[in-house]
Amino acid sequence: VTLRDYQEGFVSKVRELFASGRSAPLLVAATGSGKTVVFSYIARSAATIGRRVLILAHRDTLIKQASRKLTDYGVEHGVIMAGFTPQHHCRVQVASVQTIVRRLDKLPYRFDLVVIDEAHLSAAKSYLTIVAKLRESNPKLKILGVTGSPVRLDGKGLGSHAGGLFDDLVEGISIRDLIDQAYLVQPAVFAPAEQVDLSQVKKVGGDYDSGALAEVMDRPMITGSAIDAWRKHCPGVPAVAWCANVAHAQHVAAEFTAAGIPAVALSGDDDGAERERALAGLASGAIKIITFAMLLVEGVDQPAIGAVILLRPTMSLSSYLQVIGRGLRTIYAPGMPIATVEQRRAAILAGPKGAKCYVLDHAGLTFKHGFADDIREWSLDGVVKKKGKKKDPKEEGPAVAQCPKCYHVHPKAPVCPSCGHVYE
């Protein structure tokens, strides 16, 4: 296994913190940075010296993704989830949070290291219960959390001082850095001139109620605008569309299909094989659009996705960044060297995807949360701050401009970087 330079830095920093007496660091690294690669490497290293490792995830897609990566690394492991035969002899176990919380009293051994994937979820009672029980059998238990964003909708911090699990923060690598190093492509945002009015949409648990949101977003005018935008800015480019709920996703897929653009809606009711077929269809060109509500927010690695259509307003910065991340993965031209930044850039430009991902923002998320590649400061307190000079407190939202000619959304500048329009 060969780690990238920055991934080696993650591993070294985590080891340094454990050696210094920290027991529960949280690694924050952008979608596409290879967090699964890093924690699989750490798990393998721990198992090699006789430690028992538990990897926790909350979705079957994430569990299977971790299992595949461990298999790639030659790590014998068990999967603790409904439908899998227990492999108790394995030192590494990948587990569903929902399954293991029910089997805590039946575990035949203690663990030395717990890895928590999507660790921004770990403030939930189920995670805290699991860790407390595992610490009863091993007071020296170490924890490693990994996440792309430690900010939660409920405002809870993830630090132990705030009732969370973690005692230190490892700031990994940002989307901006990954783009600059040619490990991700650049998002190019376009949005309609008019933003949707959400003032009457009720919120539940800190975010918009999906049913009420669908009533606002699931309208022919909005869907038609998204279809027109895809045809104008990125015709033929494989895309995923994030929708308010499953019914909305089905309606959007039907509208794209009716417009002569092959589309399919995916939901949690679809089995894994159906998801894989749809994603493969996107890569082959048989399908142009996959619509979804929450299914593809996490755990999807399909580099062919070249456009992300945002049709779901959200208060969740974490979900927003994850969805944009679905389209930022690179496709390097086969056979070209990719050892240096310059080589990777050349291989991206020569590849079938190119150097950008189109973000068609019909949900106003860029105006709400800023650009996906903005540099953010993270905290275990749950507070997120944008780096850079302070803005006028009267100024609301990020420093975003929208070109009146091509509707490109970009950081404020005197000239539109897309069409060259000069702002007055």
Kindly give the residue locations of the regions a language model identified.
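Conserved helix/coil segment N-terminal to the catalytic DExD/H
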Residues: 82-113, 124-129
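Conserved RecA-like P-loop NTPase helicase motor core
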Residues: 96-101, 113, 268-376, 380-381
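Walker A/P-loop
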Residues: 20-43, 242, 266
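Conserved Walker A/P-loop ATP-binding site and its immediately adjacent core
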Residues: 36-38, 45-72, 246-247
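Post-DEXD/H (motif II) to motif III coupling segment of the RecA-like Helicase ATP-binding lobe
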Residues: 120-189
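Conserved interdomain linker/interface between the two RecA-like ATPase lobes of SF2 helicase motors
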Residues: 167-243
